[in-house]
Swiss-Prot record:
Residues 1-60 are annotated as: Disordered. The modification S-nitrosocysteine is found at C65, C93, C310. The record marks H309 as: Interaction with DNA substrate. InterPro entries: AP_endonuc_1, AP_endonuclease_F1_BS, AP_endonuclease_F1_CS, Endo/exonu/phosph_ase_sf, Endo/exonuclease/phosphatase. Probably binds two magnesium or manganese ions per subunit. It comes from Pongo pygmaeus (Bornean orangutan). NPM1 stimulates endodeoxyribonuclease activity on double-stranded DNA with AP sites, but inhibits endoribonuclease activity on single-stranded RNA containing AP sites. This is DNA repair nuclease/redox regulator APEX1. One of its GO terms (molecular function) is phosphoric diester hydrolase activity. A motif (Nuclear export signal (NES)) lies at residues 64-80.
């Protein structure tokens, strides 16, 4: 996720975080009220009803959810598990867990059916990064990382192989405030692309998680103000495009909803960004093209609270 700012810094929507004079605040509030009264309020996203059949009419047989929880323990305190129980996925993928496996909250054992649980976290950085994969069905095989030491120190990738597909959940490195990790991010993108291409050559692939990039201008509220910010630099967008082409993979949400605006999965905690829907689409389900005939729906659960990201859900008819 894009890093949170400080007072006087540039915010995720491109505005400078300043304290306005009271007179200016009053005028701004009045203008806002006038706009909302005229039906010109925040542009919100309404998740349409779930489509649970494939293009050929086959009913969905698999439901996968992915959520950047921004800290597993805090997310549980914010009732994130209540949403999971209601959504009832077959597989749940979590990113930015910030929790080592030996300190996992006991509440995770209460999740109905998701008894096969796999976790990865940095060995030397408590409270940083981390991913989890929880499944009803036992995978054929589970592995961790992408097989390159430089990129496997931060607990960012879990791979689970099932009968008809391989699932990868990832928390892709952020380029950082001031783009201090952009060069590393570019090396990661190249290595990750090679790794995924190898997986996809053997079995259809599903990649999900916080990929830390808004691919196109439609995927964030203020593209013009963020072209030099982490998550929307030309280098990151190009890297994402190369990933789609080289593996190859399809963006499941844009495949189904190519022109749907205001569909975001991340909002900074600052400046009431979520209530205004000033957000970014950073979380994805990417699929091998051979799985598109099985694609029923790709959902953004924007009303689910508990993190600065919202969960996303994929339906497949396998």
């Amino acid at each position: 996720m894009p890093k949170r700012g400080k007072k006087g810094a540039v915010a995720e929507d491109g505005d400078e975080l300043k304290t306005e004079p009271e007179a200016k605040k009053s005028k701004t509030t009045a203008k806002k009220n006038d706009k909302e009264a005229a039906g010109e309020g925040p542009a919100l996203y309404e998740d349409p009803p779930d489509q649970k059949t494939s293009p050929s009419g086959k009913p969905a047989t698999l439901k996968i959810c992915s959520w950047n929880v921004d800290g597993l323990r805090a997310w549980i305190k914010k009732k994130g598990l209540d949403w999971v129980k209601e959504e009832a996925p077959d597989i749940l993928c979590l990113q930015e867990t910030k929790c080592s496996e030996n300190k996992l909250p006991a509440e995770l054992q209460e999740l109905p059916g998701l008894s096969h649980q796999y976790w990865s976290a940095p060995s030397d950085k408590e409270g940083y990064s981390g991913v989890g994969l929880l499944s009803r069905q036992c995978p054929l095989k589970v592995s961790y990382g992408i097989g390159e030491e430089e990129h496997d120190q931060e607990g960012r990738v879990i791979v689970a192989e099932f009968d008809s597909f391989v699932l990868v959940t990832a928390y892709v490195p952020n380029a950082g405030r001031g783009l201090v990790r952009l060069e590393y991010r570019q090396r990661w993108d190249e290595a990750f692309r090679r790794f995924l291409k190898g997986l996809a050559s053997r079995k259809p692939l599903v990649l999900c998680g916080d990929l830390n990039v808004a691919h196109e201008e439609i995927d964030l509220r203020n593209p013009k103000g963020n072209k030099k910010n982490a998550g929307f630099t030309p280098q990151e967008r190009q890297g994402f495009g190369e990933l789609l082409q080289a593996v190859p993979l399809a963006d499941s949400f844009r495949h189904l909803y190519p022109n749907t605006p205001y569909a975001y999965t991340f909002w900074t905690y600052m400046m009431n960004a979520r209530s205004k829907n000033v957000g970014w689409r950073l979380d994805y389900f990417l699929l091998s093209h051979s799985l598109l005939t099985a694609l029923c729906d790709s959902k953004i659960r924007s009303k689910a609270l508990g993190s600065d990201h919202c969960p996303i859900t994929l339906y497949l008819a396998l």
